[in-house]
């Protein structure tokens, strides 16, 4: 592709490059540079890509996009923001695949993954759609499963994936859109047919620093969608909508008055939730096989999205009744022959842990037992908060390790326990997560619900940059054999 075509719609501050030069590839990692490629130098959180311009040149790069003229003897294009430039370049390189797809973006602290799976399920069953999915657990092209490394891929990988999806015949794409992705322009250049806001609670403050900045990051999505679907029960929706530029807003909720889609007569069961959904003159009874109060919100935003795309509520409800849940989201781990229940859930944030515990308290016949830890090298302020939530809502707490990463596991546990000091809730601290799970099973009583919180779909534990195999389903199954 000609350099001039790659740079279309990109404001250029300065260049000495031949705009008619043929470019063979695009990269932003100098180690991937090759003969005739365009290297985009990005100033990242840990390193500055401008340092690697000489290496890219040595590897054959024909031109570099950067934020200041390089010292190395190489044709260059200077732009104001090379990260945003990468997004524009990616759109051009892959010929704007998002324009060929009905794009649906879901943002919020919790509920993104479940919502995307529910939307995919409804559209495939009731709209005759082939749906691409991009998210935390995995990426999917229809039923084909692809590996994923982060909630929202970098802009170049994202556009490449969207091109794959379009070429494979996908009509719709539903994707989780993280606050990082919005701030770091990973989704820049994409227009969403529907943008969804699930909720906002403490998370990623190591990146955003304040809740207001975190909310404003989420709000970017509502500048880039045709319909903005939002949770009217979440108090942050007011700030989120202050400057929203989307032409149509659509609200959902359980408690808020005047919502466009409302859940009534909510019933919580051990293996499901049920409620009546109302929008305009339409009504439908809904049952979903994910046992939690917050499932109602995830279901409402999925129904709101699909209703705005032309699927009647009754059709949404019929599709949802056939859905059997999402891996690592209130997932029941089989315990044949035992009179206790083990749930696996990805709740690694304060509000998610609180929601899970409140939901389980609503149907547990025995004790509510929670086993959890907090991730290392992440927001430390939420650790005592989560400890306090666990102590307040659970009958017994087992504090253990999540992904310690480069931190000392005991230090993380001590941070969590700081939030439990003034409570009389019994607890035990066991740094080894496998031992902790065995302890929970050994001490289970009849009717107990044991929540293994934090890992969810993950089948590994990260310690000192190494991913060690750890699948809680396998741990439970193996222990039951002995």
Region locations from a protein language model:
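Acidic, Mg2+-coordinating active-site environments of NTP-dependent enzymes
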Residues: 3, 9, 66, 70-73, ...
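ATP-dependent carboxylate-amine ligase
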Residues: 1-12, 35-38, 84, 124, ...
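N-terminal leader/targeting and accessory segments in enzymes
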Residues: 1-88, 262, 267, 291, ...
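Phosphate-binding loop of NTP-binding sites
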Residues: 7-10, 86-232, 236-247, 363-364
């Amino acid at each position: 592709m000609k350099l001039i075509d790659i740079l279309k719609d990109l404001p250029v501050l300065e260049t000495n490059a031949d705009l008619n030069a043929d470019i063979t590839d695009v990269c932003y990692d100098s180690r991937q540079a090759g003969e005739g490629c365009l290297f985009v130098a990005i100033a990242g959180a840990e390193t500055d890509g401008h340092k690697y311009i000489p290496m890219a040149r040595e590897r054959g790069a024909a031109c570099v996009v950067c934020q200041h003229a390089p010292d190395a003897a190489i044709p260059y294009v200077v732009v104001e923001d090379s990260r945003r430039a990468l997004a524009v370049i990616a759109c051009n390189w892959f010929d704007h695949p998002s324009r060929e797809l009905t794009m649906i973006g879901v943002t919020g602290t919790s509920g993104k993954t479940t919502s995307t799976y529910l939307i995919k399920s409804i559209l495939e069953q009731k709209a005759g759609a082939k749906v691409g999915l991009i998210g935390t657990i995995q990426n999917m092209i229809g039923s084909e499963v692809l590996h994923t490394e982060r909630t929202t891929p970098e802009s170049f990988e994202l556009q490449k994936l969207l091109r794959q999806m379009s070429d494979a015949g996908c009509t719709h794409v539903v994707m989780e859109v993280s606050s990082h992705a919005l701030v770091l322009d990973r989704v820049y250049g994409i227009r969403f047919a529907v943008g969804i806001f699930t909720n906002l609670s403490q998370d990623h403050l190591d990146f955003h620093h304040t809740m207001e900045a975190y909310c404003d990051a989420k709000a970017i999505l509502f500048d880039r969608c045709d319909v903005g679907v939002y949770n009217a029960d979440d108090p942050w929706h007011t700030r989120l909508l202050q400057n929203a530029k989307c032409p149509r807003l659509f609200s959902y909720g359980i408690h808020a008055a005047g919502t466009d889609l409302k859940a009534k007569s909510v019933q919580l069961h051990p293996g499901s939730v049920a409620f009546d959904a109302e929008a305009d003159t339409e009504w439908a009874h809904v049952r979903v096989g994910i046992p939690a109060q917050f499932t109602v919100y995830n279901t409402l935003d999925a129904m709101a999205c699909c209703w705005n795309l032309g699927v009647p509520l009754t059709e949404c409800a019929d599709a949802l009744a056939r859905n059997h849940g999402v891996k690592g989201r209130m997932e029941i781990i089989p315990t044949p022959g035992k009179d206790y229940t083990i749930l696996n859930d990805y709740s690694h944030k304060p509000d998610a842990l609180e929601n899970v515990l409140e939901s389980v308290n609503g149907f547990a016949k025995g004790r509510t037992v929670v086993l959890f830890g907090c991730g290392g090298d992440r927001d430390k302020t939420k650790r005592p908060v989560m400890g306090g939530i666990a102590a307040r809502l659970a009958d017994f707490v087992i504090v253990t390790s999540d992904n310690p990463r480069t931190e000392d596991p005991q230090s993380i546990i001590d941070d969590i326990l700081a939030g439990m000091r003034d409570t009389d809730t019994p607890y035990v601290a066991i740094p080894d997560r496998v031992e902790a799970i065995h302890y929970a099973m050994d001490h289970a009583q009849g009717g107990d619900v044991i929540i293994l919180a934090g890992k969810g779909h993950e089948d590994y534990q990260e310690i000192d940059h190494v991913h060690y195999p750890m699948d809680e389903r396998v741990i439970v199954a193996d222990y039951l054999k002995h």
